[in-house]
Amino acid sequence: MMGFEWGFKPSSKITQSTVSSQGTGNVMIPTAGVKQKRRYANEEQEEEELPRNKNVMKYGGVSKRRPQPGSLIRGQPLPLQRGMELMNKNQLQQLLVDLMTKHPEIQQSVHTRVIGLDFSIQKCLDMLKQKSEAVYQSIPYNRSYESNKLDDYAFVRMKPQILEFLNCLVDFILDNIPPRLENLHASLKFLDICTELVIKLPRFELASNNYYYDKCIEQLSHVWCTLIEHIARDRIILLADNSSVWKSHMTRLQVYNEHSNGLLERPLQLFKSLDMGSPSAASSSTLSLQESIIYHHDTMTANENNNNSGSAATDSPFN
């Protein structure tokens, strides 16, 4: 073949003419027409090579390659453990309640695990203060709770928060007295703080709207009497401890009794009957206290019978 290698296959017409020329033994001199045909052939070859070069660019890594549908990574939900780590307290609590509602057979197992836990008194107080704050926040903005003359509209608006607070308070008190808690000092201190929280709650102008408060204070009075009974029976605590501790509780109880219109009079009298003096005085005071406790239990039973025969509210936490 005559001429240079141009990097492409020559046209069939050119090849045939070249072969025929060589066959005759004549030397073929490229003319202008042959050069023009080669130029056209070169352009056609470049057009054919261009799509192939694009494919090379596409599949060679320079251009982006569209992934096949089978190789796509699909999103998936979090595992159970990771999801529970992200859930807040309310979400976990609601989840547990829903599970126990749908599967009642697990309630006993959950309850057994819960009562086996040892919750600190400070944690209970923190929870009570949060619920007490919710009561204050539910007060209508146009009425002041300091006057203790909230109207019926305020009672309707505050009732859910009040019942939630009182229910929580009663549950925590029952969990922090003997035999659940054997430390009488801790029980008295916790009961003292709970009584103060109830006494300081805003009251309503209509007496019937204060029913839940009064009923709660009556129940607190029974708890006070119960703890005083434990103190009277434990002579070691009664004689060994500093009398100023008991007098401090008695002084605070007297203040609470004044703010509750005498609803705490009975435990106050029982406290005063305790004599933190000599052993003989303590023994005599214990006998008189036992007589007072018998009267207290009889009175409590009579009151409960009267309440059961009456028309008490169905949503009261103390019935």
From Swiss-Prot:
Keyword check for Transport = yes
Query: What's the main place this protein lives?
Result: cytoplasm
Q: Which UniProt keywords apply?
A: Cytoplasm, Nucleus, Protein transport, Transport
Give the UniProt entry's GO cellular component terms: cytoplasm; nuclear membrane
> Where does it reside?
Cytoplasm; Nucleus
Gene Ontology molecular function: any one: proteasome binding
Q: Report whether Coiled coil shows up as a keyword of the record.
A: no
Q: Name one GO biological process term.
A: protein transport
- What InterPro entries does this protein's entry cite? Cut8/Sts1_fam, Cut8/Sts1_sf
A Pfam family the protein falls into = Cut8
Q: Which domain of life is it from?
A: Eukaryota
Question: Annotated region Disordered: where?
Answer: 33-76
Query: What is this protein's function?
Result: Involved in ubiquitin-mediated protein degradation. Regulatory factor in the ubiquitin/proteasome pathway that controls the turnover of proteasome substrates. Targets proteasomes to the nucleus and facilitates the degradation of nuclear proteins.
User: What quaternary structure, including any partners, is listed in this protein's UniProt entry?
Assistant: Binds the proteasome. Interacts with karyopherin SRP1 and Proteasome subunit RPN11.
Spell out the family assignment given in the record's similarity comment.
Belongs to the cut8/STS1 family.
Indicate what this protein is called per its UniProt record.
Tethering factor for nuclear proteasome STS1
Q: Which organism is it from?
A: Saccharomyces cerevisiae (strain JAY291)
